[in-house]
Amino acid sequence: MGNITAKLVKDLRDKTGAGMMDCKKALNETDGNVDKALEWLRKKGIASAEKKSGRIAAEGSIGSYIHTGSRVGVLLELNCETDFVARGDIFQSLLKDVSMQVAACPNVEYVSIDEIPEDVVEKEKQIEMGRDDLSGKPEQIKEKIVEGRIAKRLNELVLLSQPYIKDSSLTVEDLVKQAAAKIGENIKVRRFTRYTLGEGIEKNQMDFAEEVASMKSN
């Protein structure tokens, strides 16, 4: 068994937000290996959060984030079970972090895989099935390759599947479940909207010469 020091326990706690006793137990269970202890705690945290996932989360808060330069803005609804938790530092910090994550992920359109419409999934499948590099391959192998590519593509569209911008060893889903384990309540990302300045507006690309010509003709 590795030498489990107080500093090692504290470092693991700082990384995971788990309690001191849980961190010590994780290190004992993994012979003092921090990476394995981190994984052990993550699994424990996820299991803890999943026990709460069936409970109704009807309280919460709507957060906003405006990125530097005011060119990207986000509105995000995060739900929990009680108003008391919604006002707390852990919940509000999570709300801010997830809102920032949305701002940093322009391709994200859905909260979870379950929200992706079937027609979008089917369209992605047709695109992948038609790729040149799959021609001539046996159907069974082709299906397997396409399945992997579709899963990768769909995860790119989903907020909860994104690597957390402040710690890429975690996903956004991990982050939410860690917070749920800390506060002892179910937490759900309900919905979000991302705004980009000028998005959808057709800009007039008229050059200077054309502009002068149009002025003369008036």
UniProtKB/Swiss-Prot annotation:
GO terms for molecular function: translation elongation factor activity. SUPFAM superfamilies: Elongation factor Ts (EF-Ts), dimerisation domain, UBA-like. PROSITE patterns: EF_TS_1, EF_TS_2. Pfam families: EF_TS (PF00889). GO terms for cellular component: cytoplasm. Keywords: Cytoplasm, Elongation factor, Protein biosynthesis. Residues 82-85 are annotated as: Involved in Mg(2+) ion dislocation from EF-Tu. Coiled coil: none annotated. InterPro entries: EF-Ts_dimer_sf, Transl_elong_EFTs/EF1B, Transl_elong_EFTs/EF1B_dimer, Transl_elong_Ts_CS, UBA-like_sf. It is found in: Cytoplasm. PANTHER family: ELONGATION FACTOR TS, POLYPROTEIN OF EF-TS, CHLOROPLASTIC. Belongs to the EF-Ts family. Associates with the EF-Tu.GDP complex and induces the exchange of GDP to GTP. It remains bound to the aminoacyl-tRNA.EF-Tu.GTP complex up to the GTP hydrolysis stage on the ribosome. HAMAP family: EF_Ts. This is Elongation factor Ts. The gene is tsf.
